[in-house]
Amino acid sequence: MTDITRPENPESRCGFVAIVGRPNVGKSTLLNHILGQKLSITSRKPQTTRHQVLGIKTEGPVQAIYVDTPGMHEDEPRALNRYMNKAAASALIDVDVVVFVVDQLAWTSADEMVLEKLKRVKCPVILAVNKVDKLEKRELLLPHLEALSKKRDFAEIIPLSALKETNLEPLESAVGRFLPESVHFYPDDQITDRSERFMAAEMVREKITRQLGAELPYSVAVEIEEFKHQGNTLHVSALILVEREGQKKIIIGDKGERLRSIGQEARVDMERMFGSKVMLRLWVKVKRGWADSDRALKSLGMSDF
């Protein structure tokens, strides 16, 4: 493993940490459990994360600024997929540490593709072997870790379970050791750089993803049209964009039941995060070809890198 030494007992450390990996290995779950609250949306469906999400964790003198990225995947022709790949790749620029997340004993061509992209990275790369709680034959883990250690000179290799919060402390400790001495960039109580509007849109999109499962088309986006505090109530109006009428019917459901359920669950999460009563209104609109249009992506805040 790489021997990267840092001065002992620094007064203050701060830096950027990119969390990368192929889709559905648990990157967003890892970030959420490190922070101690939900910031990135999660589901069993791969490629749920579309944006870089900045999560900030401050523990005493150490401030780690985590960037949760979309899963890197094989090249796709759609503009949305190109955007997601660019978002993931851009997270590797000017970071201080990379956490490369893989799925326990599984190693795929997509993992190899991510590893290939990491060859250009000069900072420490920590390999986080996630979901070890699901291993049926634990005796296979050590040989697998030894095989992984030969693929790259990793700064650390840490088996963990993000969901069960197993071995997260060694991971955070390793990240902290590799961060540079620096003043903190953010207030110690700040956990993200994202706006409340962005977080509201992500909460709605998560509920759509979780409720629809295999029915969900990837080409679903959420646009916040109103986000306004009036007295003790937060009024939020969100537009759900799909590409076809059939997708619209799926999201609305029989007599609007599915859409109401999505709204109820999203509202509960918003009230918990924003600390106020929320009045949430949802609409569904067909916008054909938005996931293939660079212009449409930019209008939704998904700009080129």
From Swiss-Prot:
InterPro entries: G_ERA_dom (IPR030388), GTP-bd (IPR006073), GTPase_Era-like (IPR005662), KH_dom-like_a/b (IPR015946), KH_dom_type_2 (IPR004044), KH_sf_prok-type (IPR009019), P-loop_NTPase (IPR027417), Small_GTP-bd (IPR005225). Pfam families: KH_2, MMR_HSR1. Residues 204-288 form the KH type-2 domain. GO terms for biological process: ribosomal small subunit assembly. Residues 21-28 are annotated as: G1. Residues 13-181 form the Era-type G domain. GO terms for molecular function: GTP binding; GTPase activity; ribosomal small subunit binding; small ribosomal subunit rRNA binding. GTP binds at residues 21-28, 68-72, 130-133. Residues 47-51 are annotated as: G2. The keyword Transferase does not apply. SUPFAM superfamilies: P-loop containing nucleoside triphosphate hydrolases, Prokaryotic type KH domain (KH-domain type II). It is a peripheral membrane protein. Residues 68-71 are annotated as: G3. It comes from the Bacteria. Belongs to the TRAFAC class TrmE-Era-EngA-EngB-Septin-like GTPase superfamily. Era GTPase family. An essential GTPase that binds both GDP and GTP, with rapid nucleotide exchange. Plays a role in 16S rRNA processing and 30S ribosomal subunit biogenesis and possibly also in cell cycle regulation and energy metabolism. This is GTPase Era. It comes from Marinobacter nauticus (strain ATCC 700491 / DSM 11845 / VT8) (Marinobacter aquaeolei). The lineage of its organism: Bacteria, Pseudomonadati, Pseudomonadota, Gammaproteobacteria, Pseudomonadales.
